[in-house]
């Protein structure tokens, strides 16, 4: 039983949970990952990995080269691509480039990554298999730091020394341990669509506008329409789009922050009507219209943020729970840094555990939480605020985008 209680229990098999598990496993520290969903769950949209996130992960995995990550996760990896993006913002009503970095002097520091591929790549970065148990939805947590029990809805119970809450923005662990911490809904409309086209159609309809970039970002008058590659092969291209805008008054029919999960998969007629009035340029015009959406999988996304105080983090640690990922620093997807901070969380928490274990032969769990939060708390909470501000700036009026574009031209 003593050995079992030294096991670390990780709730959630997302990026943060798997990163932590992989690094602990590589260092011989027993851990189990519990995931509520089934192994075939799909979350195949792409995210932007920044240098501060992936460099820490590559170093922790034994100084792996960036090329290893790119070959494993880039949306265009199967056709020899590198996950490159041009970082340009285009007027989605004319196609004109409004803002773009000088790519002749800028090295690639951002890598687009397919989320499913990233999870698989992390899992495969070690000789020993990770112990991931699917179909385990957390019900409650019992005990205290050093001797804690996770109870699941399937009646399974597991004892461990520490629980790592990697169960996302709607974290069950957080809602029990810190019921006062409630995700904050941002007043924005956000719809996400997924679809597939043939590679030849992609070359005809999108490639002339995007070039080799894995994302084509369109900005309008307080609304955005990014079009992104999720996965590309020689025959098929899986893409997604987002339509996001600020809320229009108190009675905005499309603003439904508490919509039930099943209803969130339905396309409201008001969205179709709105898209048809946007006067979009190509290629957005071809895909974001009422007729095209009939063949797409469309989801309503509520953008939420999570803030946790240092006292909250300390209190949770005393009860045997440490947070990683969106469970304690959820931030906007478009313009956010969430995936990168999830990687850093996993790296920094694993390092705190490994260091503690090496110095004492077993985990000094008080020091683990203290050392981890010593750097991670400010880093991640600052990122939530920064990302939220950036999210609103990316939904600015068209007149402001024009002013920014003209100023850039003047300085060029």
Swiss-Prot record:
UniProt source species: Trichophyton verrucosum (strain HKI 0517)
Record keywords, A-Z: FAD, Flavoprotein, Glycoprotein, Monooxygenase, Oxidoreductase, Signal
Positions bound to FAD: 35, 46, 119, 326, 339
Keyword Glycoprotein: yes
InterPro entries linked to this entry: FAD-bd, FAD/NAD-bd_sf
Signal sequence interval, chain numbering: 1-21
UniProt name for this protein: FAD-dependent monooxygenase nscC
Cofactor: FAD
Entry annotated with the keyword rRNA processing: no
Pathway: Secondary metabolite biosynthesis
Lineage: superkingdom: Eukaryota
Molecular-function GO term, any one: FAD binding
Job description of the protein: FAD-dependent monooxygenase; part of the gene cluster that mediates the biosynthesis of neosartoricin B, a prenylated anthracenone that probably exhibits T-cell antiproliferative activity, suggestive of a physiological role as an immunosuppressive agent. The non-reducing polyketide synthase nscA probably synthesizes and cyclizes the decaketide backbone. The hydrolase nscB then mediates the product release through hydrolysis followed by spontaneous decarboxylation. The prenyltransferase nscD catalyzes the addition of the dimethylallyl group to the aromatic C5.
């Amino acid at each position: 039983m003593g050995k079992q209680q030294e096991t670390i229990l990780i709730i959630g098999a997302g990026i943060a949970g798997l990163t932590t598990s992989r690094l602990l496993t590589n260092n011989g520290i027993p851990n189990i990952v519990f995931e509520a969903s089934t192994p075939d769950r799909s979350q195949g949209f792409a995210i932007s990995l920044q240098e501060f996130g992936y460099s820490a992960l590559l170093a922790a995995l034994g100084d792996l080269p960036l090329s290893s990550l790119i070959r494993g996760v880039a949306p265009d990896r199967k056709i020899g691509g590198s996950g490159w993006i041009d970082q340009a913002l285009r007027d989605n009503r004319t196609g004109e480039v409004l803002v773009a970095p000088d790519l002749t002097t800028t090295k690639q520091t951002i890598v687009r990554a397919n989320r499913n591929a990233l999870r698989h790549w992390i899992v495969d970065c070690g000789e020993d298999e990770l112990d991931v148990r699917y179909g385990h939805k957390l019900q409650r947590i019992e005990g205290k730091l050093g001797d804690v029990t996770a109870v699941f809805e399937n009646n399974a119970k597991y004892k461990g020394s520490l629980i790592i809450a990697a169960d996302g923005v709607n974290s069950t662990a957080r809602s029990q341990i810190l019921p006062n911490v409630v995700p904050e809904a941002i007043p924005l409309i956000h719809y996400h669509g997924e679809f597939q086209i043939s590679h030849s159609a992609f070359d005809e309809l999108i490639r002339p506008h995007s070039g080799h970039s894995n994302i084509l970002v369109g900005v309008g008058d307080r609304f955005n329409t990014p079009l992104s590659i999720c996965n590309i092969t020689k025959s098929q291209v899986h893409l997604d789009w987002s339509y996001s805008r600020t809320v229009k008054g108190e009675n905005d029919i499309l603003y439904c922050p508490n919509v039930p999960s099943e209803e969130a998969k339905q396309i409201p007629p008001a969205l179709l009507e709105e898209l048809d009035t946007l006067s979009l340029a190509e290629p957005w015009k071809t895909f974001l219209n009422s007729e095209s959406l009939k063949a797409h999988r469309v989801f309503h996304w509520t953008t939420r943020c999570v803030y946790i105080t240092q006292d909250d983090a300390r209190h949770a640690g005393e009860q045997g729970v440490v947070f990683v990922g969106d469970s304690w620093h959820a931030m906007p997807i478009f313009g956010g840094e969430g995936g990168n901070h999830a990687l850093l969380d996993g790296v920094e928490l694993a390092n705190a555990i490994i260091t503690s274990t090496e110095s004492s032969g077993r985990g000094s769990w008080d020091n683990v939480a203290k050392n981890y939060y010593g750097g991670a708390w400010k880093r991640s909470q600052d990122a939530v605020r920064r990302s939220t501000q950036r999210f609103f700036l990316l939904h600015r009026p068209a007149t402001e985008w024009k002013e920014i574009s003209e100023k850039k031209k003047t300085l060029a």
